[in-house]
């Protein structure tokens, strides 16, 4: 078993424990599971089938994460990012007026360019050119964005005409539960309780039941919705247009700096990656982007 784990994931029993890895994987899954709800709901706004978008989101996350685990041998989860998804839905489709098929074609082209840049190591070269201060800022920026996303979804902060961002109703519903969850997780983390994040998520979910926030599912097990309504639904009729060029270049730049920012933020805690591993991590992200477009 240890030999198999080492061959697949670079697992070393002297440095790692199976129970710790399982706990970390479960915690990461629960922390990332919101994407399975948020991403399809965003794509539904532009006309995509929500059930098919759910299945596509799930498959893209599975493919990206397995690539990272087996090929790059890194404990990183890959899934559709909220920034590019918001640009996909609200800018390309709603603001620019294009169909989601047009936007999906842009993602496919951007993903292919992403792979080419990774193969030629252009992204590795870009990473070396980034000053240390910008590397730190990228990690902080990603963290602030995720925090803003969570606080907004929980209605702790809301849009305000005067101050842009305002405080929501924090004594009721989702906002109250979010604050309780943050406090529980923070206390457990400060006390260095093993599995603090997982325990915090579970306790917050249970507390949400009497508050009426946590909804119990109608069915505990079911087959995933069909992928066919969105599978390979591309529109190549407007590939050679200025708007497509703008879309591709914008999404490419977002992906490059989002990926570099995330990896650099993670390595600030775990130590620098060897060049070979770093290149493989970039390639995994590029391949996952291309597969996700399909």
What are these regions (language model features)?
Residues 158-172, 210-253:
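Helix-loop-helix junctions that connect adjacent transmembrane segments
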Residues 1-17:
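Short, Lys/Arg-rich, polar N-terminal cytosolic tail immediately upstream
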Residues 62-70, 90-91, 115, 183-187, ...:
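Alpha-helical transmembrane segments of multipass membrane proteins
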Residues 21-38, 107, 240-261:
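Core transmembrane alpha-helical segments of multi-pass membrane transporters/permeases
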Residues 23-170:
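Early transmembrane hairpin of solute transport permeases
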Residues 18-23, 104, 138, 238-250, ...:
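Select transmembrane alpha-helical segments in multipass membrane proteins
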Residues 183-226, 252-256:
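Flexible hinge motifs at transmembrane-helix junctions and intramembrane kinks/re-entrant loops
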Residues 14, 43-59, 63, 249-294:
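Membrane-embedded helical hairpins/re-entrant loop segments and their flanking transmembrane helices
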């Amino acid at each position: 078993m240890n030999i198999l784990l080492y061959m697949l994931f670079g697992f070393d029993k002297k440095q790692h424990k199976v129970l710790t890895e399982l706990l970390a994987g479960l915690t990461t899954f629960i922390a990332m599971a919101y994407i399975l709800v948020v991403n399809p709901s965003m794509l539904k706004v532009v006309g995509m089938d929500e059930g098919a978008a759910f299945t596509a989101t799930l498959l893209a996350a599975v493919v990206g994460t397995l690539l990272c685990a087996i090929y790059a041998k890194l404990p990183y989860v890959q899934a559709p990012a909220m920034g590019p998804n918001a640009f996909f839905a609200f800018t390309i489709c709603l603001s620019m007026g294009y169909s989601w098929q047009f936007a999906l074609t842009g993602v496919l082209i951007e993903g292919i360019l992403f792979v080419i840049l990774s193969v030629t190591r252009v992204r590795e070269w870009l990473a070396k050119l980034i000053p240390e201060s910008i590397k730190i800022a990228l990690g902080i920026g990603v963290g602030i964005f995720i925090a803003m996303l969570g606080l907004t979804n929980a209605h702790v902060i809301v849009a305000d005409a005067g101050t842009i961002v305002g405080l929501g109703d924090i004594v009721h519903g989702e906002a109250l539960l979010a604050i309780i969850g943050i406090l529980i997780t923070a206390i457990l983390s400060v006390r260095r309780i093993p599995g603090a994040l997982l325990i915090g998520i579970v306790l917050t979910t249970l507390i949400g039941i009497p508050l009426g926030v946590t909804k119990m599912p109608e069915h505990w097990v079911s087959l995933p919705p069909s992928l066919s309504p969105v599978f390979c639904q591309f529109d190549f009729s407007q590939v050679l247009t200025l708007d497509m060029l703008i879309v591709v270049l914008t999404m490419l730049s977002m992906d490059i700096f989002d990926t570099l920012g995330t990896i650099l933020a993670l390595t600030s805690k775990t130590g620098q990656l060897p060049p070979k591993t770093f290149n493989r991590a970039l390639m995994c992200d590029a391949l996952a982007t291309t597969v996700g477009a399909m």
